[in-house]
């Protein structure tokens, strides 16, 4: 092991979180994994320790449960783990139109992608202030720059925009205290997330030139976070789209989004 520092990664059992664990471990960081699937976490922790000669621990938690952030933080404190990097990566999808979703599902969606991020971030910001430094990776989305799309995207984009603003607020308020937050905003990334959430047909419809490999996304995200970058968007096309969304007049952007969603905006 190169050091005694740990990286805490939520949503670590698959997809981007799985690759992030490998990227950090390959750089000598010890890892704390958390997700809902104990079998996958156990297998991944063994794999990381064997391959990279680091320490890897895991705590099973469902971030749709409002008590989960406190339980995860308590686990780290009880095991005296020096967490120097927090990765807010856990995901949640709703494969239904907005008018068809039930309140329980919406509550879980908002808790996983919003409330749990706030609570985990606050717990570890307090620790980072004591230790004098810390880094936070906010795994957001390219969707955070654009107006909400149709279906599940009506909620997804706005929540990810909130995550970005929270990351910005961390930098504004705590950068002078040694704490940085990096908003990682990938576009279409090839993972098992879309299959598991019943949206593989939507992913298949995306042109291949718009898709990014999950390993390259994870590698770039880790490098950006370690450098303390405020925002990182992978790939030229995604960067260009993010730029357009930032400079295009809001009314025009909404009209274009409405057309793409099959609707109209007058």
Show where each model-derived region lies.
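Conserved glycine-rich cofactor-binding loop
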Residues: 13-15
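Conserved glycine-rich Rossmann-like NAD(P)H-binding loop of the short-chain dehydrogenase/reductase
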Residues: 27-44
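Conserved NAD(P)H cofactor-binding loop of Rossmann-fold oxidoreductase domains
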Residues: 89-94
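Substrate-binding pocket helix/loop in short-chain dehydrogenase/reductase
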Residues: 97-99, 105-110
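Active-site helix of classical SDR
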Residues: 121, 159
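Residue(s) in the substrate-gating loop at a strand-loop-helix junction
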Residues: 141
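C-terminal helical subdomain
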Residues: 183, 204-241
